[in-house]
């Protein structure tokens, strides 16, 4: 755990070795926790009839949403519009990424009835675009992939005409697991890059930048007609030049949709926020990314992977694919 008021800095080894070194450095709280919050970072409070109906539905079917588990700031807006990202494979993640609020621990065995219940919720909500994600299950990679394939099939059965978007973990690069998901033909396959390579060891515990790119490349190779997508957080200490290099790498593996959003520290136990990006900076990043050939770029302070996911997919010209 990182001590309060500190952060990691990654620098070149002092002896010139070709490797990065992590060291603990003091962080100025005034820089990491801005006050008051600017207007463009204020989200709608989670209230309203639809919000409470969706919450009751999730509870009645024993389902989790990443909206709640990850403390998403857009939960009020999205749930009021009856859109949610369902999170499968339990509510305990086997990894300890420094940015993520999802609980960590040793999960129970995978519940293979969960895909049916997720599809039931999708059908009851009348969704035209469903987003499903999961925690990391490094204890059962192939089982986790099978659950994704099952939920895609179940949604097609219970909610015909609904597009399916999956936000998947990296499955530790397991090709069988990745192929299992892709062969179920989700209309959109999302796997987030999250940060720049230099910060991976701090931001994404257990992940590798090259593995992320290879997953997206392999998914597109297996099904060229499918839409691939990835997201990046800003405000963790990255440089603009590093972000642009990530965008170029994603474009090189033919990633179709890119999302860019502000990292917001979930609690004092998580990585400090290095700085806030302004709406103008997000607009500039979007302009640069579009020049690289992405079919859609969603860029803004409150943007998250599945924020306006339906509109993102529609902007690519995507229709329901089977």
What is each of the regions a protein language model found here?
Residues 17-85, 116, 120, 150-162, ...:
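Auxiliary Fe-S-binding modules of radical SAM enzymes
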Residues 66-77, 91-103:
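Local cysteine-cluster metal-coordination motifs and their immediate loop/turn environment
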Residues 68, 88-89, 133, 167, ...:
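A secondary-structure boundary/capping signal
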Residues 76-87, 99-113:
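Iron-sulfur (Fe-S) cluster-binding segments and ferredoxin-like electron-carrier domains
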Residues 92, 96, 101, 126, ...:
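Conserved functional loop/turn residues at catalytic and ligand-binding sites
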Residues 101-117, 124-175, 181-215, 229, ...:
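Core AdoMet radical
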């Amino acid at each position: 755990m990182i001590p309060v008021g500190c952060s990691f800095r990654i620098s070149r080894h002092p002896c010139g070795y070709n490797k990065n070194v992590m060291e603990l450095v003091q962080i100025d709280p005034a820089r990491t926790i801005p006050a008051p919050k600017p207007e463009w970072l204020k989200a709608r409070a989670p209230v309203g009839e639809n919000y409470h109906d969706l919450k009751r539905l999730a509870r009645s079917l024993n389902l989790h949403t990443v909206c709640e588990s990850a403390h998403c700031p857009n939960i009020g807006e999205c749930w009021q519009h009856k859109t949610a990202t369902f999170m499968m494979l339990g509510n305990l993640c086997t990894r300890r990424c420094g940015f993520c609020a999802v609980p960590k621990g040793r999960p129970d065995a995978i519940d293979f009835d969960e895909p049916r219940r997720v599809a039931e919720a999708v059908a009851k909500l009348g969704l035209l675009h469903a987003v499903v994600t999961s925690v990391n299950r490094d204890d059962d990679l192939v089982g986790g992939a099978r659950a994704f394939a099952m939920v895609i099939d179940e949604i097609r059965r219970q909610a015909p005409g609904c597009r399916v978007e999956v936000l998947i973990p990296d499955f530790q690069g397991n090709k069988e697991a990745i192929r299992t998901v892709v062969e179920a033909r989700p209309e959109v396959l999302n796997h987030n890059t999250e940060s720049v390579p230099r910060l991976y060891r701090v931001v994404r515990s257990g992940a590798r930048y090259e593995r992320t790119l290879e997953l997206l490349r392999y998914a597109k190779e297996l099904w060229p007609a499918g839409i691939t997508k990835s997201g990046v957080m800003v405000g963790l200490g990255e440089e603009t030049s590093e972000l642009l290099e990530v965008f170029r790498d994603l474009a090189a593996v033919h990633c179709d949709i890119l999302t860019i959003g502000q990292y917001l520290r979930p609690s004092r136990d998580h990585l400090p926020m290095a700085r806030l990006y302004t709406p103008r900076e997000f607009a500039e990043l979007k302009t640069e990314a579009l020049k690289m050939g992405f079919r859609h770029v969603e860029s803004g302070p409150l943007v998250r992977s599945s924020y306006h996911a339906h509109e993102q997919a529609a902007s690519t010209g995507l229709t329901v694919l089977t």
